[in-house]
Amino acid sequence: MQKIIVTGGLGFIGSNLIKILLQKKYKVINIDKISYASNFYNVKNFKKNKNYSFIKCDINYKKKILNILKRNKPVGIFNIAAETHVDRSIDGPKAFINSNILGVFNLLEAFKNYSKSNNKIKLIHISTDEVFGDLKKGRSHENFAYNPTSPYAASKAASDHLVSSYIKTYDLRAIVTNCSNNYGPRQHPEKLIPKLIYNILKNRPLPIYGKGKNSREWIHVYDHCEALVKVFKKGKLGEFYNIGSNKNLNNLEITKLLLKIAKKIIKINSNVKIKLVKDRPGHDFRYALNSNKIKKRLNWNSKIKFEKGLYETFLWYYKNQSFYDSFDKKDIIRRLGLKND
């Protein structure tokens, strides 16, 4: 049975990817440093699976990563370990530089060293559409120039360039993916959709930045993870692949749709109302990806319709409210990203 390493596997995307990899009969080694966003709740359903194991390790620990590679001899690494919340990057960029740039550098060094004795291993580096920056119209394709605006986006852009440079300079077997906004079960409640659901369930107002017109492309985490597996199996080494759904909605549309869904499941308290709040500094207005490359070359398409996926997502958080209890309440309700005031 082949082994796969997933970095950041206690997080949202990582834990969902591990679930799919186990279903596809891989042995999975989850490497996570256990940050504020890490949650053992996310892996509780398969932590006793004989094909799953966990190692506490920061990807900055180059020697330890190399030892893990030598000991386990995996066929692939999915690098999902990252700081990802834009608002937090505004308040404290240093953590993003440390994890998303220095961490990727040290992971690449360990990978390069190990590749000398194993020239079959592949690295899939997971990135974001935010590296392309604000897009007034059209959709960003893989050859678009990077134009990051937040410290988070800049750190991810730097990591993408690092991976690309190691591919070209050291002939490393790696692929980079850039994905649009994810939603689904087990997402940290600092993010828009789980935070809105939390506020609905707790009878709280629904804070929306600015005028609520900022638009994002939304993809279910299951579709994203299936795309990652497809890239691992069939993707061309050295290439970049965009992963998106072509489904754009603004924040007000998301909120109104969630309220519509909630009314079918629970009784809505009168306190649950949309509340427009001060916008995030440098808030990009629109992101949108052109995903034709992965669709045409790898025969991948997103399958989950947004309205159905959002309904199932609300239902999951409603039925698993103990998930919220596994986080510090202050992390859920606290407003971040206003440090420039």
Outline where the language-model segments fall.
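N-terminal Rossmann-like NAD(P)+-binding domain of SDR-like oxidoreductases, especially those catalyzing
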Residues: 1-182, 232, 251, 285, ...
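C-terminal substrate-binding subdomain of Rossmann-fold SDR/epimerase-dehydratase oxidoreductases
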Residues: 4, 20, 38, 57, ...
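Residue-level recognition of oxygen-bearing side chains
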Residues: 64, 95, 102, 131, ...
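Proline-centered turn/helix-capping motifs that create local helix->coil transitions or kinks
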Residues: 116, 124, 136-137, 171, ...
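A glycine/serine/threonine-rich, flexible loop-to-helix segment
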Residues: 138, 189-197
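Active-site helix-initiating loop/hinge in glycosyltransferases
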Residues: 184, 188, 217-220
